[in-house]
Amino acid sequence: MPKVFPKENAKHQYEPIYAFKRGMKFRVFSSYGPESPDLDVYIQRKNANNEWEKPQKIMGEVNSKKDEVYPFFDSENGYLYFSSKGHETMGGFDLFRSVYSLETNQSSDVENLHFPFSSPNDDFFYVPDPANGNANFASNRNGKLAAIQTYLV
């Protein structure tokens, strides 16, 4: 896989994380980009030759003036889930979602998932599992330094 924005990410010692299913023709991820000093959410699509095209910043309300990280697009219900410090939060990174259109690259108003999903600590990487009616996310809400736990809800 080609690196995206290698100069910008190297400057911050950051490596984007991708979460997508095999065979998908797109991927969403957070990255430092050429237009912003903060982490923003991008989409990258595969072309007809099965090569990754240039990433595009997600348009609309998702990206703020602070960091957005760990995005996941649920194509079954059209929601883009992500964590942010830049929208109205309970503290740290909170979990958010926005209706997102792959066709127009446009996101709608951002919705905080609130407690019990978001907490005063860092909560991130919300991944729904519609087939089983649950979701997973990670958090350091237990208060232990550098201790991250995953939750099934």
Question: Model-flagged regions — what are they?
Answer:
Residues M1-V153:
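Short, conserved micro-motifs composed of acidic
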